[in-house]
Design a protein with these regions (language model features):
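Active-site catalytic loop in hydrolytic enzyme cores
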Residues: 87-89, 93, 141-172, 341-444
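CN hydrolase (nitrilase-like) catalytic-core segments centered on the catalytic cysteine
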Residues: 130, 286, 294, 302-333, ...
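Non-cytosolic juxtamembrane linkers/loops
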Residues: 7, 14-17, 196, 214-279, ...
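Soluble catalytic regions of membrane-associated enzymes that act on cell-envelope
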Residues: 224-379, 411-425, 431, 435
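Membrane-embedded alpha-helical bundles of multi-pass enzymes
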Residues: 2-229, 465, 479-480, 506, ...
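Conserved hydrophobic/aromatic beta-strand scaffold that supports enzyme active sites
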Residues: 34-37, 111, 243, 359-361, ...
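Short, conserved active-site loops that position catalytic residues or coordinate cofactors/metal ions
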Residues: 37-54, 79, 245-246, 281-300, ...
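Generic structural signal for well-ordered alpha-helices
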Residues: 109, 113, 270-274, 409, ...
C-alpha cells in the first residue's frame, strides 16, 4: 500500500490543511447551531447550521480521516455545552452527564447514517439521517424515561415566534423537519457545484433547483408572517390574573423566613398588587404563586398539615371571586408491609412516603384540587427504570430523586361562588409545572381535556443568571402557538409573563427582582390542528426511519452473507 493511503478504504489520508478545514467547519457548526438558543431573533441561522457539519463529514469520509465518530462527538459536546452549560449551576454531575449523554446520542445518529452509506447511495442516506434525527427527537418528547429534549432543532425559533405560526399544525418537530430540509437542500446544491455536475445540468435544472431551494426557504416564513398578522388577538372572554414573583432564593429558602412568614409576605404583596392596579377582587380572579412555594402538605389531610392552606383560606374569606394557584411539595403516606411503589421511601415509624411536585388551586371555601407533575427531571426528581435503579439507589443511600407523577394530566378549575357559597362559574385551567412546558404534546393534553387557559409555574432560580431561564420562557411561546392558548407564567425569580396565542410576550417581569403582573388573560375554546391530531410530523418521520433502518439492516446482512459465500 502506498504511503498516505488509508488501508481500510483505499482512499488518500487527510492532509493537515484538510484537517484544519474540518476543525474550522466544526467550530462554525457550533457557533451557528448555538446562536439561536442564546441570542434573540437569530433562529434563521438554524436553516444553515448543519451544512458545516455535513461538509466536515463529507471531507472526512472522502479523505479517509480516522475516528470520524470523535469529530462528530466533539461537535455535539461543544454545541450542548455552549447552550446548556447552565445545568451545572444546579447539579454539576447532572449537567456534565446531560451534555455528554445527549451528545453521545446525537453522534450515534450520525454513526448510523455513516453505516447506512455502505448500502444506500446518492441522497438516500441523507434523507435517512433527517428522518432518524426527528424520530429520536419524537422519542425524547413522548416515550423516553431518560429525556432531555431541550435542544430539539425546532426550538431554535422560540425567540422568532412570528416565523413559525405554522407550529399550530406541526408542532416544534415541523420546525426540525424544515431545518433539515433547508440544510440538506443547500448542502446538495454545494455538492452539485463542487463535483462539476452543474456543468452537465440542463437549463431547466440550473433554474429550477435553485428556485425550489429559495421557495423552501421562504414559503413558510411568508405564510407565517401573513398568519401572524391575520390572527385575532382579541379573545371573546378574559380572566383577571395576578402573577406574583416572590424572588426567594431556593438555596436559602428557610434561612431568613419561616413558611408562615413567606405566606404572609406573599398575601401582603397580593393586596398591594390589587390596590396598585385598582382591581376589584370580588370578580373572578386567578392569583398565582410559583412552583414549590410551600411544602409539608400531606395529601388528603391538608387542613391539619398545612399552615399555608390555613393562611390562604383566611385571606380568601373576603374575596369570593379569587382562586389561588400555587406550587407545593406534597406527600402520600402508606402503612403497609411492602412498598406501594419503587419510588416509595421507608420512614422511621414503618410507613412509606411518596413525594410529589404539585400544583394546588383553592378558593375561599377551602376546597382544593391538586395536580402532580408528571414530566419529571431525571435524577433530581425522577428515577428512570425504577425496577433496576431503585436497588442501586438504595445501596447509595437514596441519592436519586423519587417523585411520583400522575399517569395523565388533569385540570384545575377556577371557580366563582356566590355569597351562599354556591358555584356560579367554572373555568378549566391547565397547569404545566416547570420542565413540563418543554413537551409539546404534553401541553396539548390539557387542551384536549378542555383547558381554556394554560399556566406555567416554575422556579428557574437554580441556574442563576444564565441563558437557561430565558430559554425556558421562550419555549412557552411555542406552546402558546401550538395550543392556541394564552399562557400565564409564574416564576419564582423570573421571568414571569403573559403570552398570547401568537407567542407574543405581552407583559414580563425582570430577572431576580420581586415583581407582580396584574392583567387579563384570554380564554379560548378552539382546538388547533396540532392539538386535535397530535405530532403527525414526529410519527411519520419515526415510521420512515424505522422502515429505512430495517431495509438497510436487511441489505447489509445480505451483502455480508454474499461476501462470505464469495
Amino acid at each position: 500500500m502506498k504511503p498516505g493511503i488509508n488501508e481500510k478504504n483505499g482512499k488518500p489520508e487527510a492532509s493537515r490543511p484538510k484537517v484544519r478545514i474540518m476543525a474550522i467547519l466544526l467550530a462554525l457548526f457550533v457557533i451557528l447551531a448555538s446562536l439561536p438558543f442564546l441570542v434573540p431573533h437569530t433562529g434563521l441561522l438554524s436553516l444553515f447550521c448543519l451544512v458545516p457539519l455535513l461538509c466536515m463529514e463529507h471531507i472526512g469520509t472522502e479523505n479517509g480521516v480516522k475516528r470520524m465518530w470523535l469529530w462528530h462527538y466533539s461537535a455535539f459536546v461543544l454545541w450542548n455545552a455552549a447552550t446548556t452549560f447552565w445545568v451545572c449551576n444546579a447539579t454539576v454531575g447532572g449537567g456534565i452527564f446531560a451534555i455528554l449523554a445527549n451528545a453521545f446520542q446525537m453522534s450515534l445518529i450520525f454513526g448510523t447514517f455513516r453505516w447506512s452509506r455502505r448500502v444506500l447511495k446518492g441522497i438516500l442516506p441523507y434523507i435517512f439521517l433527517a428522518f432518524l434525527w426527528i424520530a429520536w427527537e419524537h422519542w425524547y418528547l413522548t416515550s423516553a424515561q431518560i429525556s432531555w429534549p431541550w435542544l430539539v432543532l425546532g426550538n431554535s425559533f422560540a425567540r422568532t415566534a412570528s416565523l413559525v405560526q405554522w407550529y399550530e399544525f406541526t408542532g416544534a418537530l415541523g420546525g426540525s423537519l424544515w431545518i433539515w430540509s433547508c440544510n440538506l437542500g443547500l448542502f446538495g446544491l454545494m455538492m452539485w457545484a463542487a463535483t462539476g455536475k452543474i456543468a452537465q445540468a440542463g437549463r431547466v435544472a440550473l433554474v429550477s433547483l435553485p428556485l425550489m431551494y429559495i421557495l423552501l426557504l421562504t414559503a413558510l416564513p411568508v405564510y407565517s408572517l401573513l398568519r401572524y398578522k391575520a390572527k385575532d388577538t382579541e379573545p371573546d372572554s378574559t380572566l383577571d390574573v395576578i402573577v406574583l414573583q416572590p424572588n426567594i432564593d431556593p438555596y436559602h429558602k428557610f434561612e431568613a423566613l419561616t413558611q408562615s412568614q413567606q405566606n404572609a409576605l406573599l398575601l401582603k404583596e397580593f393586596d398591594a398588587a390589587l390596590a396598585e392596579e385598582g382591581y376589584d377582587s370580588t370578580g373572578i380572579t386567578l392569583a398565582l404563586a410559583p412552583e414549590t412555594f410551600t411544602g409539608g402538605i400531606v395529601n388528603g389531610n391538608i387542613e391539619e398539615t398545612s399552615i399555608t392552606w390555613r393562611q390562604f383560606k383566611a385571606y380568601l374569606q373576603d374575596k369570593p371571586g379569587m382562586n389561588l394557584l400555587f406550587g407545593a411539595s406534597t406527600y402520600d403516606y402508606t402503612f403497609s408491609k411492602n412498598a406501594p411503589s419503587y419510588n416509595a421511601r421507608k420512614c422511621r415509624d414503618g410507613s412509606w412516603v411518596e413525594y410529589h411536585n404539585s400544583a394546588i388551586i383553592m378558593d375561599r371555601s377551602g376546597e382544593t384540587e391538586t395536580y402532580h407533575k408528571s414530566k419529571l427531571v431525571v435524577g433530581v426528581e425522577m428515577m428512570p427504570y425504577p425496577a433496576f435503579f431503585s436497588k442501586i439507589d438504595n445501596m447509595l443511600g437514596g441519592v436519586i430523586g423519587r417523585c411520583v407523577g400522575q399517569d395523565e394530566v388533569s385540570l384545575l378549575n377556577c371557580v366563582q361562588r356566590d355569597s351562599l357559597g354556591r358555584i356560579t362559574g367554572r373555568i378549566p385551567v391547565g397547569c404545566a409545572i416547570c420542565y413540563e412546558s418543554v413537551y409539546p404534546e404534553h401541553c396539548t393534553e390539557y387542551v384536549r381535556k378542555g383547558a381554556e387557559l394554560l399556566t406555567v409555574i416554575t422556579n428557574d432560580a437554580w441556574w442563576g443568571d444564565t441563558p437557561g431561564y430565558r430559554q425556558h420562557l421562550s419555549y412557552s411561546s411555542l406552546r402558546a402557538i401550538e395550543t392556541g392558548r394564552y399562557i400565564v407564567r409564574c416564576a419564582n425569580t423570573g421571568i414571569s409573563a403573559i403570552i398570547n396565542p401568537r407567542g407574543d410576550i405581552l407583559e414580563e417581569t425582570e430577572w431576580w427582582k420581586p415583581a407582580h403582573i396584574v392583567s387579563k388573560a384570554g380564554l379560548e375554546d378552539r382546538k388547533t390542528f396540532f392539538v386535535t391530531y397530535g405530532d403527525i410530523t414526529g410519527r411519520i418521520c419515526s415510521l420512515m426511519a424505522i422502515m429505512i433502518l430495517m431495509s438497510v439492516a436487511v441489505r447489509a446482512f445480505v451483502a455480508r452473507r454474499q461476501q462470505k459465500q464469495a
